[in-house]
């Protein structure tokens, strides 16, 4: 992803590059000088050429000869690119006197008033979102900062302005030549009619003469000259340098952490300048190594223990033979970077283009290309065979993962003993890791046709305004008749399309597959790519029209149909998915578990050029087979070989040839070149590369995460089996293992790709354990690095190829600012730079407009036309109107008709759906901080509106968020209209079907359509927008919009002066802006921007507008912060303890908030999904989802929606509609304005958000499950997190804080009402249709379905046949549906958000739902289905059981135990219940065909209905076979002939949320208080004479939680009753928190409770708030976070209730100790108290700290002795509820070591029961192992409890027995457990009391899911288990 174009993927950028190059030098006619350039040459758009290359070009040569005659120039006087660069960046003479160029500019700039307004605007805008700057940020402070920074970069500013002026004046030249004079009254600028050059006087001895292609300079007594592209290059670079220097100096002044200082920046730039000064053009070889060097410097900081050669990239870059002459400069850079951190190096990394570009050696590039192409490839046949097999493995497994069945295939030689063949036959999931997997078995598996070429793919599908190559005959004609290769009609694809016959791509591609292409079309032009640093030109390709049609179409097929089955390829990912994947891959390097992840960066040698047919065939033949055309892709390299290839950029000496078009001379043109060509088969070659990489990874048994696009392949490999020491560092043995694996893997990569014929650069294929770099995005140790400088460098007005209108220039600034903020931490410095840049655009538009000054002198408009009260007014304007003009240009909004500036809220966020409320709320907020009352008044009017006298509903339908303002059309709108006018009236279009289609562009007819579409009383504009887009009007307008290159528009409209028309529109627009606010507006804002926006829409369009107005959080919400836990009705955001710059430099424990796209909650029907492949139908088909979602089926509006489909196909529309029961999700939230995804994404580096934990659940008034309201939650969270993040990042030393986003404006949030169809249905009865036109109509017989669509439709029909239940709201309960959902989540078949599970938890009976889930789990196991559908994750059950009521009911019913739990992280329960077959109950199980795995649901439903079926082996075999089959109709019988099924199961189709959300919310969450006994007296115990070193605790220290709990409860209750306590501190453990709450509820006490929270959970929900809601209200209000309030707590009156794993002591003098927490008292001086009577056998003490007392350890020991002597009060215990009947607080164990309730061991039956329970617990761990470390610790806990219980019940003296070694050995998956405990046996093993766990297969390893196969041995003595470090 390129930060210049952040929304484009690499392929799109390549296409963008080719567009730019393709429009160069197309015109060669004699009158070329009189034809205005469409876009102008404002910046470098092509590679720099040498003089020899340029003079071969006829146009340049003509200009050169003219310059020779007029100026006497010669080749020796020509400046090199480096000389021009030096002139522009450091030697430009600045003369500020009037009469010289800069002086004339400066005097005019200085004459423009109100520059100081910028300073006021900047400080006001910053204050809107940065509260920490409220005090010191003033206009004078901003001015001081700007002036100080400007003084440091004065030369760069002045030089930038001079050269931008030179470039702008140069682009006036064609127009001024027509007039024969300059239109400027500047003394420094003259037009010389004789030479037709502009003369510019820069200084007394510096004069510039500029022509169309040559710039002559008189500097002193020297006359020098340079081609204009050299000047463009220099002008670009001086502008870029000014931007980055200003930005760095600004960051210095603002003290931005981890910045590149201006001093350091200048040093870095100086090294490159010195290099170019010393080496000239050859210096670019050194500049080209800059990026690699900086990456190598970061890599050199890797862990040398892990990375075999961490200095590889740095060393090879410095020692590269090509860098020998310039190594000094590389070493200087190396030394400069030595003291920089990775953030700063990454920032400097973006400067790689700051030194410009070399003059390329075109012939050298051609020779290099042909040299690589001539290499004969003889790849190993074994590798080719393995690649074919690997492709099948990857495609088949991925296809099955997506569709749950395999692709259509043929097994030529079926082998019954082949695991692969069996899996394919039975539709079972393939696992390549099983022992029976035999890779060569793929050889007998052949792919068949699975995908269709859509019928409606035709000329229009690929119609784009792109450059093409002429065909052979066309090229021969132009060379023969005009001795040139150029001709616009032959070079523009759009023009060619108009004259082509109708081409259906399905037939076209079939013809190519069968016969190839005609020779006339086999021609490829190559041209040098621009903006490269390589001296030898890198050549891109232009193809003939049909050749391009073939490549574009087949690549589109791969993109649309195939790439989704290769998730490793990122070419088609959206921005958010790309960002998340980069975070995921880079974050693996910091996991810190029993593995280590390293990142490989692969650098191929000329990747494209190395490709050959023999290399690609193993993959390409199979790709073709998937489309039923085996040669479709395999013919690629045959076409290359048979094509004539020529240099198409004009520098070659070409001769016409009637056969080849151009005579192949072996220099400038050639044939027989089979090698790949840049950009022509990127997707296919990428698939091949990825398949090869995964093949290599398989050999090394490592997990691979791959990100690939083209030759940029980055992969992370995870090496398992690592061991870490106590501080988390890898041990030496593990480091050696990792190094060895990395070396082997690296060598295998190099060897395999070398043998294949795709060599890697061994010196630059580097590996790192910290640095991840993909597409210029850099991550270090999992954190994205700040690197805004590359994007900042391009923030200037003349930065792209658009027409330079005011609006486009401001958009250039806005795009650059948004791209820069994406790699920046916050927007403060960008507010400075954007405001000053907007001001400069506004100034230049008045004194030197790039467009209007072509035709008129630069002067202020004398009037502007506005509208008031429905009438147009001509308002005179003067310089007094400039203040409002400048304000509009710096703060305006395109939605209001202003220039499209960005405001700070827009910069930091992408995706907010309503630009109008965004603007209005920002202006309202900013207005408060403006100091100057005059400016405040002007800014106020930016939110006022006057409406247009006319109503053009087409504008509203095209942009539903628009308002009908009075601004005139301008810029691109004019171009679009000219394109439409041409297509409407063109005579060039010889294709009758196209001409028929273009007739729809008639303005009158189209206006009638839009008027009818908007004829309703109220306008549901989002729906109307989609309807219009789905009609032929929208389709045809889409074609017209593709003609977007101005050069094409100019060529099409030969009789219209395109630029003059655009210039007149621009003049009108500037006049409008100056006049806009001179009169009172029609409409003024109210106090609420949401109300204002709605009024503006309703009144301007003269009808109510529905569904687009969304309140902005800037006005809707008030941001507050507190250091105390006060729970407001608000969105809440907790911070951790990190603040200051550390917040940017570290990763917290919270979940990084990356935003989200809001997706639709239901899918289209299967038939709709299938028809959606057709280009013509896609929008209309997608629109059908609105029926029964937005409008009921049968309504008039639904008929109009159906009409859109009926107008373009004869298919029956009924199959495209979902029933209301299947539809869920609110239309207004889930459907984007354009019908695409919507949502919100932070546009800044989001690493600091990991230091926060936020939740929207706390916004009780607007929380989940409530009313449907117009809240954009993503923007609320982004707004809150950004403000909190910037504040904490700017102020070091802050305590933990809580931030709140609280509702501020009571009018902003409103409930969204469903539209009234009576009011919203338009009077539209027909839509245009063009039956018989293949471009606009498709008959259903021509729609061919992909194989998976055929299967889905068949399944859907069968499922419809199965359905026997219509939902009436009662026949299936919410608990039944929840049980089904939980089961599908358990097996990984259904992904449901955590927030939805919380909604489920609040409504259903958890125990009932769990029973339905368990029934399915147990039945699946009994039927043998668990191997096909294993349990994947139990997190959904843990979340569901997270309330007291739920855990209580499930504990009583299923004996589920709580293993651990915290306030923040939620609970973790014992999942061994999933393996208890005795819990199966007789209950009917329903089937919901809307959910996944319908055959599995049916199988379980049938099994549940018949006990006979469960016990009959034949029935089981039948049922077992069903879920693996692709079709259902063959299996109407589910039982053997001897058994009959009971009544058919309940089968329905409904969205689950319909059932669950309708259940009433349960608000009562009572805490039970089982012990109501009175407190008892606490008494002091005595010391006992025991040595501390030898002190041992008696058996009851290790009593079960059941026995400890009652006593702990009584102890805490007695303490709170007898001691004056003001604060209660409780560790973050759910059990303890709820126990404390129960005690206070029992005592009727209200006491501040402080939770000692350790860290964030890192999940999408915030458990703290949800758990808090479960406490009683009187306790809930007193709960706070300890660390936020510790300064308020008085230690002497505070009591701490700790949990055993606490490592940090808190400030409390009273401690309640229990169980293992006795260790906390070991070194504490103080006294110990115990209750005078006890409630149970468990131990609990109160420890009172006393610094004057001795250590309390002996008193603790004394307490134990006293406890042993006291009698247990059985009567008291029996008089109260026993623990097993309590809620989560009191009934469930916290840890397995205290929580396993074993039966007494005295009987064989008891021992057997214990063994079975232990086995189920270990199996539950085996089913969900996670990392091996957590699996091992889980096993240790369970086995520890087993052994402890064994000794406690079988041996009299536990401590004595524990002194013996007790070994535990675990191998393999478990099949049985044999406990051996015989103290009298003569057998050593039995006497040593080993516990044996039998393994399932002889010698087989225990296999951890998704991990390297390994064997785990646990050999630990009991004392190690007891006393070793505890990590849960």
UniProtKB/Swiss-Prot annotation:
It is found in: Virion; Host cytoplasm. Keywords: ATP-binding, Host cytoplasm, Hydrolase, Methyltransferase, mRNA capping, mRNA processing, Multifunctional enzyme, Nucleotide-binding, Nucleotidyltransferase, RNA-directed RNA polymerase, S-adenosyl-L-methionine, Transferase, Viral RNA replication, Virion. It comes from Taro vein chlorosis virus. Its EC number is 2.7.7.48, 3.6.1.-, 2.7.7.88, 2.1.1.375. Belongs to the rhabdoviridae protein L family. PROSITE patterns: RDRP_SSRNA_NEG_NONSEG (PS50526). One of its GO terms (cellular component) is host cell cytoplasm. RNA-directed RNA polymerase that catalyzes the transcription of viral mRNAs, their capping and polyadenylation. The template is composed of the viral RNA tightly encapsidated by the nucleoprotein (N). The viral polymerase binds to the genomic RNA at the 3' leader promoter, and transcribes subsequently all viral mRNAs with a decreasing efficiency. The first gene is the most transcribed, and the last the least transcribed. The viral phosphoprotein acts as a processivity factor. Capping is concomitant with initiation of mRNA transcription. GO terms for molecular function: ATP binding; GTPase activity; mRNA 5'-cap (guanine-N7-)-methyltransferase activity; RNA-directed RNA polymerase activity. Residues 596-782 form the RdRp catalytic domain. The keyword Iron does not apply. This is RNA-directed RNA polymerase L. NCBIfam families: paramyx_RNAcap. It holds the Pfam family Mononeg_mRNAcap.
